[in-house]
C-alpha cells in the first residue's frame, strides 16, 4: 500500500461532488460479491419453506428484483458509471442459523474500466427490500441488515476479500 494520503475520489479539491474520470483506466475483467440478510419471523421461514407467502413466490421475485436493480445502479446512485454488466447472480437462502432470516448473496461481473461493487450492493439491497415487501403481510417487523461487499476482483487496486 502506498504512503500517499488517501482521499475521497468522488469529491474535487473544492469539496464538490464529481464523477471520477475513468477514461485512462484499463478495461479489465472485474467481479464483486455482496451479501445481506433479512431477519424474519419463524412463521415466515415456515411459509417460505412450505406453501409460500400471500403475495406469491417471494424468493423468485426478490431474485429478479435484485438482478434488475444491479442494471439500474447508475440511475439510482448519482456518481456511479454506466457499465456493461456481463452477468448477475442473486441467491437467496432461507435459514435459521443464527436466527430466522433470508440470506442474500449477489455477484456481478463486467469487463470495463471500473468495478461493480455498487452494483452488487444494489442487487442485495433491492432483493432484501423485495423480501420485506413480499412478507410484510405476515411479518411487519422484518429487518434488513448486514449489507456489505464480501469480495472484489480486478482493477488497479487488485483483489480484496472481507477478512
Curated annotation (Swiss-Prot):
This is Cyclic pyranopterin monophosphate synthase. It catalyses: (8S)-3',8-cyclo-7,8-dihydroguanosine 5'-triphosphate = cyclic pyranopterin phosphate + diphosphate. Homohexamer; trimer of dimers. Belongs to the MoaC family. Keywords: Lyase, Molybdenum cofactor biosynthesis. Catalyzes the conversion of (8S)-3',8-cyclo-7,8-dihydroguanosine 5'-triphosphate to cyclic pyranopterin monophosphate (cPMP). The keyword Lyase applies. The keyword Membrane does not apply. Substrate binds at residues 79-81, 118-119. One of its GO terms (molecular function) is cyclic pyranopterin monophosphate synthase activity. PANTHER family: CYCLIC PYRANOPTERIN MONOPHOSPHATE SYNTHASE (PTHR22960:SF29), MOLYBDOPTERIN COFACTOR SYNTHESIS PROTEIN A (PTHR22960). Its EC number is 4.6.1.17. Pathway: Cofactor biosynthesis; molybdopterin biosynthesis. GO terms for biological process: Mo-molybdopterin cofactor biosynthetic process. The active site is at residue 133. Signal peptide: none annotated. It comes from Nocardioides sp. (strain ATCC BAA-499 / JS614). The gene is moaC.
